[in-house]
Amino acid sequence: SGTSPLLPAITFILD
């Protein structure tokens, strides 16, 4: 949600 690499990382884990 912007410049936070945390969210994309979580999405990758969930996927």
UniProtKB/Swiss-Prot annotation:
Other comments on record: On the 2D-gel the determined pI of this unknown protein is: 4.9, its MW is: 32.3 kDa.
Name listed for the protein in its UniProt record: Unknown protein from spot 662 of 2D-PAGE of etiolated coleoptile
Domain of life assignment: Eukaryota
Species of provenance: Zea mays
